[in-house]
Amino acid sequence: YMLPGGEIQPKPFVSDVRERVANQPSDIFGSGMSLVVEGEVMQPRPGHMGSVELQTNFHPLWSEGMQLYWKEFKSGDKLSLVFDSEVEGTYYAKIQFTVAPDYGTFALRVNDKVITPEVSLTNGEVSLLLVNLGRVNLEKGKNELQIESIALAPGHDTGFFGIDKLTLRK
């Protein structure tokens, strides 16, 4: 602290400054602009195999207490989920999935671009898995997340899949 009338010693030295000074967290971490799309608000396109429903009150860690649940499909079947974005651009994407003993392996695309050729959602117990998808391009308006069943869980004739949420960060 300084008494009224005091002087700062030494004087500010700015002639050799090469980088902008971080004055707030967003100067280091970016604007923090993110878009969270809950699985349960994504709209399935017509023509998919199996059934799609909202599953609630099953897993306590699901965001908003529910997930989008796709069931009774075969290997090779596809599900397209539509979601809206108010902005366009490149975002870093993460998806939180449910994993379980009867879930299989899937390929994921956003707007027809492969973002992960294979992700296994088979696990010994029901839990959540956060998958980093890297960079994805969003369009203003309608966007599409495409899920393709690559392999069913061992010993199962039909498949199961659950998505909790998609998080996109600038």
Residue ranges and their predicted role:
Residues 1-170:
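Extracytoplasmic
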